[in-house]
Every structure is written in structure tokens, then in C-alpha cells.
Amino acid sequence: MSAFDRYLHTVLLAAQAEARDDGSAAIEARHALLAVAAQDGTEPQRVLAAAGLGPAELKAALDREFAHSLGAAGVAPGAFDLHATPDPDHRPRPGASLRLALDRMAGSHRKKDLTPLHLLHALLAAEVGTVPRALDLAGVDRAALAARVREGL
């Protein structure tokens, strides 16, 4: 197994745990981004941290996006005291946003040339969805962040 394969496996397992912990039915790009940010000592983690996007900051941005989306639907986030009850036996499978990111990554380079930064680049490349909305609400310059990732590729 290559170094990238080990990295991807670790990220996907961490993303699965994130999805399970928040009661999600599927592993989405947001879970993978949180997992990438939590991989201490990796280049993607350093790029995100340099942009002020550690795991806690990303989680806060994703929570703001969720509240904003509920508000757009006319629902106040605090109106209900509903919390997900994680099922330790539930094994979420990759959802649409994660599959799209993985497809973007796989389509951009040969497998043997992939690095952890390619995964981050693919996660940040989404034009629509939870991740770009969360980053926009957090005031992140997504174009500058993507450019910084591309510099490292």
C-alpha cells in the first residue's frame, strides 16, 4: 500500500467516524474535510491551519452553515433540542459530495502521482454544497486557499 493509499484510508476512516458521530446517513465532503484538518503533520493540515482552518474552526464554520441553511428554510436552529444519537454499529458509506470529490481527484492525475494535497484540492474544488457555503460564511477566500493548495501540488 502506497503512502497516499494509507493517508486516504486514514482520512476515510476518520471521516466515517465524523459522519457517525453527527448522525449522518453518509460520509460527505464536510466529514472528509474535517478528517483532513485533523491529520497532524500533513501538508493539507498545515495549509488549512495557515488559513486559520483547524478542526475546531472548520466545525464552527460547518455549524454556522447548518444554522444558516435552516434559517433559509424558516427554521430557527435553537427551536428544537434534537441531537443525533450516534449508533456505534452504523457504518456510513460515501455520499454524493464525497464521491464527487474523489472522482475529481482521480480524474486529475494518475493514481501513482496522487498526494494528500490532491485530496484537499478536490474537496475545495466544489462550486456548490456544504463545504463552499461553510467556507464562504466563515469569510475564507476560497480562490486564494485553492491557489495555495495548487502551489504545493
Model region roles, listed by residue range:
Residues M1-L153:
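Histone-fold recognition with a strong bias for associated Lys/Arg-rich disordered tails
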